């Protein structure tokens, strides 16, 4: 009788374990997640908010007249003159090689970002998995406050970074993407210094934070890189923040459906003293303006 009882308990335990495993498989497999749902609701809310709508019109020579010559040449070469002043840009990447850091694993991720132009605002969503377990991330910047959240198994928050350094990092990331959404460049809170015919330093001040970096252009005046010292790479055990150069690289410019030239490839790099770490390496799947 005792043996029969033990077997029943074992069968019950196995049944419960199998049910839990099946439940997890279903939970992991469905598209829904609380973080993704929050991202979608934020995008819907922001796109409906009139503060984030431009006044319309088109990008003209007169509108870009105050910009440095290299920036004007970039806007002209890429075909933005005569196109609508966009309220936002949506950029999508698929199967990006994403490094978790030095001597850490590399994941394949899907990445979707929105840059809004009437007010500095950036939202981005990471979708990936680690050993079959969903891993998702959400980068957000709105009203001068930014953060980064990472969630494992759609339920457990493993990264949740906020603070002034994150605010500044989000602002400089927003600035780095402005050549692909040139309505941003028409704002009066960005100043420029043309250091030579192929390099322009840009400084943006918003909500009490200032971030800057250098845009570099090739001979065709396609933007090929943006480098800044305003991104924190780590905080040590004593609470000291460490900053090293951070670079966005663009290339492979192609004509989009609306005729403008846009980069097809993008890398994001930490320029460590002992060598570069390319932590984001992917091809641009789509760019949509609204």
Listing of model-derived features with the role each one plays in the protein:
Residues 2-21:
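N-terminal Sec-pathway targeting helices
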Residues 149-208:
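Flexible, processing/modification-adjacent segments and terminal tails
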Residues 111-117, 138-140, 188-195, 214-216, ...:
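Short, exposed beta-strand/loop patches in secreted or surface proteins that constitute
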Residues 72-156:
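N-terminal mature ectodomain segment of secretory-pathway/periplasmic proteins
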Residues 26-111:
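N-terminal cleavable signal peptides for secretion/export
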Residues 202-289:
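Gly/Pro-enriched, hydrophobic low-complexity segments
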Residues 21-47, 220-236, 290:
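Membrane-interacting alpha-helical segments
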């Amino acid at each position: 009788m005792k043996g029969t009882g033990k077997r029943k308990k074992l069968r019950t335990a196995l049944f419960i374990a199998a049910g839990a495993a099946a439940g997890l498989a279903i939970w992991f497999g469905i598209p829904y997640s609380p973080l993704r749902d929050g991202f979608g609701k934020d995008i819907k809310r922001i796109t409906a908010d009139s503060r984030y709508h431009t006044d319309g019109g088109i990008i003209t020579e007169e509108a870009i007249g105050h910009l440095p010559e290299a920036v004007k040449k970039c806007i002209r070469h890429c075909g933005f003159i005569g196109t609508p002043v966009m309220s936002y840009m949506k950029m999508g990447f698929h199967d990006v090689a994403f490094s978790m850091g030095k001597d850490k694993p590399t994941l394949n991720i899907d990445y979707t970002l929105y840059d809004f132009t009437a007010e500095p605002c950036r939202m981005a969503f990471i979708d990936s998995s680690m050993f079959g377990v969903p891993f998702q991330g959400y980068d957000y910047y709105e009203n001068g406050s930014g953060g980064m959240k990472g969630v494992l198994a759609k339920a457990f928050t493993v990264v949740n970074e906020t603070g002034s350094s994150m605010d500044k990092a989000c602002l400089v990331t927003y600035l780095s993407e402005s050549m692909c959404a040139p309505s941003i460049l028409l704002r009066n809170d960005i100043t420029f210094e043309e250091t030579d015919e192929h390099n322009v330093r840009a400084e943006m001040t918003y909500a009490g934070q200032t971030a800057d970096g250098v845009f570099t252009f090739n001979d065709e005046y396609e933007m090929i890189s943006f480098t800044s010292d305003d991104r924190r790479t780590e905080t040590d055990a004593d609470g000291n923040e460490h900053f090293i150069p951070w670079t966005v690289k663009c290339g492979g410019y192609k004509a989009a459906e609306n005729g403008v030239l846009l980069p097809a490839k993008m890398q994001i790099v930490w320029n460590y003293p002992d060598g570069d770490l390319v932590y984001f390496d992917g091809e641009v799947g789509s760019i949509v303006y609204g």
